[in-house]
Design a protein with these regions (language model features):
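Extended, low-hydrophobicity, polar/charged segments
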Residues: 2-160
């Protein structure tokens, strides 16, 4: 039912840092912000969703708070291109994880990762670990380190 290969990539990624025991797997789907929040028992905003945008032949990943939305104007100012998300059928081959499990851990080479300021409201956040039923709780310093992020950016808007 769940994609086993990708969670293994995610687990192996954290194993090298001695953090594999912090990876959580669920008997239920955590493929959307709402489902992940339910599985973890936390507010949806604390789910660090990973958004994948086309860039030439590859993509960039932006981690944002669960309640944040991409602000097209801010995105274009930052990246000098329109925000065009990868098609679902492109995600696995380009990023290395399936839709619902996309995260910056154990991804294909050559992908730039950015963290959106919307996450900074929280001490810890919960990104996926490569499958549609996984997560790991990380503080912001850990998220920055283990995602190999280039920088914190401001390309989202929060609900009014």
């Amino acid at each position: 039912r769940w994609s086993g290969m990708s969670i293994e990539k995610g687990r192996a990624y954290f194993r090298q840092f001695g953090m594999e025991d912090r990876v959580r797997e669920f008997d239920v789907s955590s493929a959307t912000v709402e489902l992940a929040a339910l599985a973890l028992g936390v507010e949806g905003a604390r789910i660090a969703k990973t958004l994948s945008f086309k860039k030439d032949d590859s993509c960039i990943l932006i981690l944002a708070a669960g309640d944040a939305r991409i602000d097209n104007h801010k995105f274009k100012d930052k990246f000098h291109m329109k925000a065009k998300m990868l098609a679902p059928e492109e995600v696995l081959s380009i990023v290395g994880h399936p839709v619902g499990g996309v995260c910056p851990f154990g991804i294909n080479d050559g992908i730039d990762v950015y963290l959106d300021e919307s996450l900074k409201r929280f001490e810890t956040v919960f990104p996926a670990v490569g499958s549609a039923n996984s997560a790991i709780e990380l503080d912001l310093d850990e998220l920055y380190k283990y995602s190999n992020a280039i920088e914190w950016i401001d390309v989202c808007k929060l609900p009014e």
